[in-house]
Amino acid sequence: MKKEEKISAEEVKRVKGLGCLKDKRYEDIFNVRVLTRNGKITAQEARVIAEASDRFGSGSITMTTRLTQEIQGVPYDKLDDLFAFLAENGLKTGGTGAKVRPVVSCKGTTCQYGLLDTYDLSEKIHERFFEGYHDMKLPHKFKIAVGGCPNNCVKPDLNDIGIVGQRVFRRDLEKCRGCKKCQVEANCPIKVAHVQDGKLNWDGCNNCGRCAGKCPFHVTDDYVEGAKIYIGGRWGKRTAMGRPLSKIFTDMEEVMEVVDRAILLFRDEGNPGERFADTVARLGFEYVEKKLLGE
């Protein structure tokens, strides 16, 4: 196809569904999203994407907010060759449309603050829902993020479903001596832990776990790690903060079931064109929570 030949709106829409976004400056140039596993690729995959960019695109690669790699400047008449080259090397394009979008996660598996194996959980979500529900048509896009701790580096509470690692203490206040220099208080990064009336008070604790093992009298030695799940978050032109479900999940398979129920509820009860945040607001948080908890 000749350069600058106009492409029909139907064809632009079709290739957008394959992860190819038209460069507004040209009639026949596209930026093509190559899928990753939640931002992770191997060194060999990186070499393949770099070669693909040189052979079929402009030689430039960008990262999207959902951690796909976007090959810049691919002419329309090279798209099929690019798809074939990537497929030969075990890669594919995508990440657009009214469906489950690429899952994002932080580095909680290796981060000093991580309370979840974010790599493992997000890869399971990727396989079961991004890949497994690839052909499921939803009312709108559906975004999932996995964060390892309340630092919220990947902003889970601004996604349709956000999962946040938690460390929940089984605090034994009988052991508390009401120390004038309380080590739990000293190590609380959000400054909510404090001694009140001779005992430790931690109303407002966000379960970051930074005080674990800090009390010399073992008040914070016993804990369980799990996850908080936020629903109905959204960023963009209309922002909505997600709300947390009322329980902490210690079984990751239960987390997977909640994600599954949320996607199916959105499919079945969402209105065409509305985001999950709007669905939750319209149906009511309490109703949606009961559905997601299987009650």
PLM region descriptions:
Residues 271-287, 291:
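Bimodal "functional hotspot" detector
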Residues 4-7, 32-179, 204:
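Small-residue-enriched alpha-helical segments and adjacent helix-cap loops
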Residues 13-40, 104-108, 243-244:
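Short glycine-/aliphatic-rich beta-strand segments at the starts of folded cytosolic domains
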Residues 21-26, 57-63, 194:
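Short, flexible, solvent-exposed loop/turn segments with mixed acidic/basic and small polar residues
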Residues 1-24, 284:
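Charge-rich, low-complexity segments
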Residues 181-200, 206, 210-226:
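Iron-sulfur cluster-binding cysteine motifs and their immediate structural context
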Residues 19-22, 161-165, 227-235:
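Short beta-strand elements
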Residues 225-227, 233-270:
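A hydrophobic, small-residue-rich beta->alpha segment in the mid-to-C-terminal subdomain
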